[in-house]
Amino acid sequence: MAKADFYETLGVAKSADEKELKSAFRKLAMKYHPDKNPDDKEAERKFKEINEAYEMLKDPQKRAAYDRYGHAAFEHGGMGGGGGGFAGGGFSDIFEDIFGEMMGGGRGRQRSAGGRERGADLRYNMEITLEEAFSGKTAQIRVPTSITCDVCSGSGAKPGTQPKNCGTCQGTGRVRAAQGFFSIERTCPTCHGRGQIIPDPCPKCHGQGRVTEERSLSVNIPAGIEDGTRIRLQGEGEAGTRGGPAGDLYIFLSVKPHEFYQRDGADLYCAVPISMTTAALGGTFDVATLDGTKSRVSVPEGTQAGKQFRLKGKGMPVLRSAQTGDLYIQIQIETPQKLTKRQRELLQEFEQISSKENNPESTGFFARMKEFFEG
């Protein structure tokens, strides 16, 4: 029976990136996990296929070989004499070992003793408000991830049993094979470099040493955090295999755009429209700030559009500092609309009695323009 295409098994396109692969795998693994489907042979078969597909496609080298050669890349003897297939030596291991030894390099990628591997790092995207960035917060998040199996404590072996040293490589995880004029040391095809085999797999994790589960975590968001900041939670990523160290969880923060404020570092900017008469005659208005207080802004007579007023210390806190940015009020002057007859008459009268001193900028601008073009 022909093996299913790995991409079809995970339900992703061949162009899928690492994030899409991982997302598809988690979704399917949770759906077909044996714990959720007891005594369901079909679900167990699909679960194994999903694991196999993800294990191959998450490794860039294995994925490249599969994209080029298909399942033939992993069949026994696929190297024409090397034996063992891709997962047990294959293209990358042979090439890495040949060139590594010739160039004085090391052995290529290896697992530690007993097959222990560090768990994968995880990414979590979190969106917060500007108010939350101002005051800081403790957020509760739920992260689907692989955790150490509580039945076998990560060994992968059935309780009461132990993994055994691989008889093929004598527990080293590496074997030597003749390859033309070279003696090549490559990954053991029996234990896949772990150095151990599991005769009696754990019934819960099926020998993986890890299970997929959703965890609840508390994340401290410090006051003054900026958009695009990355927070690292050490050891909160996926559990390692066979007792290996866990990966890290990275929280990528984005701050929602605010209705009134724009942020530039620790400073805030707020555009405030005022009436034409307030700009001409002067006045005051109150501005609500992010610290929950109100600040009064005094507008002097003759204030022009674009004028900025600085409210010292009313901006954002500087991360891990006692300093605080400023709030800048940017004045916009609103031109009156839908005038009544009386309002129009008053404005026309005002225009008639106005002098150059009332509008020095516009008067001077047009005078300079006329002189420039007419000489």
UniProtKB/Swiss-Prot annotation:
Cofactor: binding comment: Binds 2 Zn(2+) ions per monomer.
InterPro entries: DnaJ, DnaJ_C, DnaJ_domain, DnaJ_domain_CS, HSP40/DnaJ_pept-bd, HSP_DnaJ_Cys-rich_dom, HSP_DnaJ_Cys-rich_dom_sf, J_dom_sf
Subcellular location: Cytoplasm
Cofactor(s), by name: Zn(2+)
Xref: PROSITE patterns: DNAJ_1, DNAJ_2, ZF_CR
Pfam families, per the entry: DnaJ, DnaJ_C, DnaJ_CXXCXGXG
Molecular function as annotated in GO: ATP binding; heat shock protein binding; unfolded protein binding; zinc ion binding
CXXCXGXG motif repeat boundaries on the chain: 149-156, 166-173, 188-195, 202-209
Binding site for Zn(2+) 1: 149, 152, 202, 205
Protein family membership: Belongs to the DnaJ family.
Free-text comment on this protein's domains from its UniProt entry: The J domain is necessary and sufficient to stimulate DnaK ATPase activity. Zinc center 1 plays an important role in the autonomous, DnaK-independent chaperone activity of DnaJ. Zinc center 2 is essential for interaction with DnaK and for DnaJ activity.
Assembly and interaction partners: Homodimer.
PANTHER family with a match to the protein in the record: CHAPERONE PROTEIN DNAJ, DNAJ HOMOLOG 1, MITOCHONDRIAL-RELATED
General function of this protein: Participates actively in the response to hyperosmotic and heat shock by preventing the aggregation of stress-denatured proteins and by disaggregating proteins, also in an autonomous, DnaK-independent fashion. Unfolded proteins bind initially to DnaJ; upon interaction with the DnaJ-bound protein, DnaK hydrolyzes its bound ATP, resulting in the formation of a stable complex. GrpE releases ADP from DnaK; ATP binding to DnaK triggers the release of the substrate protein, thus completing the reaction cycle.
Designated name of the protein: Chaperone protein DnaJ
Gene that this sequence comes from: dnaJ
